């Protein structure tokens, strides 16, 4: 299977896993146009769509794609805001699509019903885990989001994270503000700057790299606690407390 990142909007990625015969699994098509263009240029033929959550920039292209390919299968979380013709999938379920097994992982926090898909060594994390960051908690709680991130962090280090947005440089600015002496993080920022200067995606990225550089996955490290503690209104009694304060800090941060 070949992985393709299709840019959409200002900073979204639509992901496509493409078989040798051109049949493809499409993840989070917020726009139809990039998928239609890939079909025109590369002979890509969508056979199924996977949705991680209901936000418009992740599902907005579904109707047009189903008009173009009426037999297109659709899978997403059990949520009334997901297109009604979707097959609902939940935690622990496995899908076999184009001879590839997709494992469904429940990751509430960004939204209450958010899911991720793990397949062929690739983690399609939607807006839960970002390169050097994590999603805002629009509907979930800090304990939920922390648990979701820990669930993803427990996957093999060679797992490639395919998230929904090109946020690496913006997230790097905050991460370095929190963890300025992290040499691996400094290198990642430099690499990401070079990649973006060349108009290349900074994704996918290995989970091993994220574990070394993403502050939201490093709440057990003393340097992260030390950075967060002065901002906290009360004692940080757990990693969840550290995570919650770190997320509040990120919400307020301006580079």
Curated annotation (Swiss-Prot):
<feature type="binding site">
    <location>
        <position position="57"/>
    </location>
    <ligand>
        <name>Zn(2+) 2</name>
    </ligand>
</feature>
<keyword id="KW-0862">Zinc</keyword>
<dbReference type="InterPro" id="IPR032282">
    <property type="entry name" value="HAGH_C"/>
</dbReference>
<keyword id="KW-0479">Metal-binding</keyword>
<dbReference type="InterPro" id="IPR036866">
    <property type="entry name" value="RibonucZ/Hydroxyglut_hydro"/>
</dbReference>
<comment type="pathway">
    <text>Secondary metabolite metabolism; methylglyoxal degradation; (R)-lactate from methylglyoxal: step 2/2.</text>
</comment>
<dbReference type="GO" id="GO:0004416">
    <property type="term" value="F:hydroxyacylglutathione hydrolase activity"/>
</dbReference>
<feature type="binding site">
    <location>
        <position position="127"/>
    </location>
    <ligand>
        <name>Zn(2+) 2</name>
    </ligand>
</feature>
<dbReference type="InterPro" id="IPR035680">
    <property type="entry name" value="Clx_II_MBL"/>
</dbReference>
<dbReference type="GO" id="GO:0019243">
    <property type="term" value="P:methylglyoxal catabolic process to D-lactate via S-lactoyl-glutathione"/>
</dbReference>
<dbReference type="InterPro" id="IPR001279">
    <property type="entry name" value="Metallo-B-lactamas"/>
</dbReference>
<feature type="binding site">
    <location>
        <position position="127"/>
    </location>
    <ligand>
        <name>Zn(2+) 1</name>
    </ligand>
</feature>
<feature type="binding site">
    <location>
        <position position="55"/>
    </location>
    <ligand>
        <name>Zn(2+) 1</name>
    </ligand>
</feature>
<dbReference type="Pfam" id="PF16123">
    <property type="entry name" value="HAGH_C"/>
</dbReference>
<comment type="subunit">
    <text>Monomer.</text>
</comment>
<dbReference type="Pfam" id="PF00753">
    <property type="entry name" value="Lactamase_B"/>
</dbReference>
<feature type="binding site">
    <location>
        <position position="58"/>
    </location>
    <ligand>
        <name>Zn(2+) 2</name>
    </ligand>
</feature>
<comment type="function">
    <text>Thiolesterase that catalyzes the hydrolysis of S-D-lactoyl-glutathione to form glutathione and D-lactic acid.</text>
</comment>
<protein>
    <recommendedName>
        <fullName>Hydroxyacylglutathione hydrolase</fullName>
        <ecNumber>3.1.2.6</ecNumber>
    </recommendedName>
</protein>
<feature type="binding site">
    <location>
        <position position="165"/>
    </location>
    <ligand>
        <name>Zn(2+) 2</name>
    </ligand>
</feature>
<comment type="similarity">
    <text>Belongs to the metallo-beta-lactamase superfamily. Glyoxalase II family.</text>
</comment>
<keyword id="KW-0378">Hydrolase</keyword>
<dbReference type="InterPro" id="IPR050110">
    <property type="entry name" value="Glyoxalase_II_hydrolase"/>
</dbReference>
<dbReference type="InterPro" id="IPR017782">
    <property type="entry name" value="Hydroxyacylglutathione_Hdrlase"/>
</dbReference>
<feature type="binding site">
    <location>
        <position position="53"/>
    </location>
    <ligand>
        <name>Zn(2+) 1</name>
    </ligand>
</feature>
<feature type="binding site">
    <location>
        <position position="110"/>
    </location>
    <ligand>
        <name>Zn(2+) 1</name>
    </ligand>
</feature>
<dbReference type="GO" id="GO:0046872">
    <property type="term" value="F:metal ion binding"/>
</dbReference>
């Amino acid at each position: 299977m070949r992985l393709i990142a299709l840019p959409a909007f200002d900073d979204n990625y639509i992901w496509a896993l493409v078989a040798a015969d051109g049949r493809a699994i499409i993840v989070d098509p917020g726009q139809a146009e990039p998928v239609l263009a890939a079909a025109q240029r590369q002979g890509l033929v969508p056979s199924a769509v996977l949705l991680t959550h209901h936000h418009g920039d992740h599902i907005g292209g579904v109707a047009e794609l189903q008009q173009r390919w009426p037999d297109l299968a659709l899978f997403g979380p059990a949520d009334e805001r997901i297109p009604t013709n979707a097959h609902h999938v939940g935690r622990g379920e496995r899908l076999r699509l184009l001879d590839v097994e997709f494992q469904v992982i429940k990751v509430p926090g960004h939204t209450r019903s958010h899911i991720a898909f793990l397949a062929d060594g690739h983690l399609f994390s939607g807006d839960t885990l970002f390169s050097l960051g994590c999603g805002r908690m629009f509907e979930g709680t800090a304990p939920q989001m922390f648990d979701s991130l820990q669930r993803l962090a427990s996957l093999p280090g060679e797992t490639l994270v395919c998230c929904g947005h090109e946020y690496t440089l913006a997230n790097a600015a905050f991460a370095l503000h929190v963890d300025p002496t992290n040499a691996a993080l400094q290198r990642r920022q430099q690499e990401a700057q070079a990649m973006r200067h060349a108009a290349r995606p900074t994704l996918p990225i290995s989970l091993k790299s994220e574990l070394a550089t993403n502050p939201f996955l490093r709440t057990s490290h003393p340097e992260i606690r030390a950075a967060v503690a002065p901002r906290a209104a009360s004692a940080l009694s757990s990693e969840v407390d550290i995570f919650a304060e770190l997320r509040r800090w990120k919400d307020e941060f301006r580079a």
